[in-house]
Amino acid sequence: MTEDRPKLRLLDIVPVQTQAGQQFLLRDPQRLSPQELVVPTDIAFLLSQFDGSHTIREAQVSYVRRFGSLITTDKIKDLLKRLDEALLLDTERFREFGRRLQAEFRSRPTRAAAHAGQSYEEGAAAFISTWQPRLDAAAPPDDFALDGEHPALIAPHYDMTAAAESYAAAYALLAQAPQPDAAVVLGIGHTGGSAPFTLTRKPFETPFGALETDAEIIDQLAEAAEFDVFADEFLHRDEHSVEFQAVLLHFLYCEREEQPKIVPILCGGYQRQGGELADPGSVGPVSKFLEALRGIIAEDSRRVAVIASADLSHIGARFGQPPPLTQTHLDLARRHDMALLEQVKRGDAEGLYQVFAQDENRYNVCGVPAIYALLRALPIGEGRLLSYKQATEPQTQSCVSFGSVGLR
């Protein structure tokens, strides 16, 4: 990008309904910038021209052709200044800011609780008073227990309040089982990364202190991988998918003398160059890493749990699909989710991938890489669906579905 060819960073651009009609919310999915901007439709179009290849003049011409009116160069430059100050443009200002944040993260002995006080209660007493009644109200099935050496769960990573019932269903079932010594937590790297899997050795801060990581398993995985598992470690800084499970695990065993150590793994998307979906079993570094994970767990004499932190379908305007969101859309998404979950309950990793890929991921299921990794890591015999919900957002005409599954 040059000063005359501005480039917007990769942002979440979410349609929202306001008193002025439909507008667009700009926010940083990496949470490096705390600022959010709401812009009207015409400015959103103008921003789409800021891809590093168009000059300000070319963007101005495209705007005139689209809307039939002139937007002045001064107005465009004022907009670019606001975006740069908000750290939403790919500029040297932003890159320097990012370098400072990465240096700060590397220097910290622990991974800070990025979402405490926002997504969940910051203090231990407040967390317990909120979440213990939720677990008490959950009713784990009488005929399905996680009594094997390697208990496994799928739990959401959606908003912890909106998905509280699903989280509680998963962790109430785990609470009935013998305590694991370690837990592999398979999250989703929502903001990308160069490696298919990203680890960190940093303990996770929670309302109950710092939850230690399992250095033994992490070191074995790092040695077995064909790539640097720490190359994108900074992605862990703000990623919520592992954090939410770490917090709930620490809560579950906070009164025990020892808590399980965790293995935090962020899973990347499975794609070839050109954007085509790729069978992860055919991608050498992915397959070798998962084979190593399976072998490490099998050879470990301790009780090792595996948790996939995964949501299901993402549909509607927020995810690039035209409104309105109808009951038919919800029914089709639910049918697709259930087809995926049938493969999960059978422990069929390849079947899961085939259902996922058959329509080029039309339903934007973000959690498949973590679920697939779980099914490759353990010999699953059967599963039980514990909870399922579709959370709709009327303001954005969108819906995210999630659930919880016990596996053994």
Residue ranges and their predicted role:
Residues 1-49:
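Acidic, low-complexity/disordered tracts enriched in E/D and polar residues
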Residues 109-372, 376-382, 388-397, 406:
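Active-site histidine-anchored catalytic micro-motif
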Residues 31-118, 124-125:
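Long, charge-rich, low-complexity alpha-helical segments
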Residues 15, 23-25, 329, 400-408:
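C-terminal functional modules of predominantly eukaryotic multidomain proteins
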Residues 7-18, 98-103, 180, 212-223:
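Short, charge-rich amphipathic segments
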Residues 20, 68, 87-89, 205, ...:
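Glycine-centered secondary-structure boundary/capping sites
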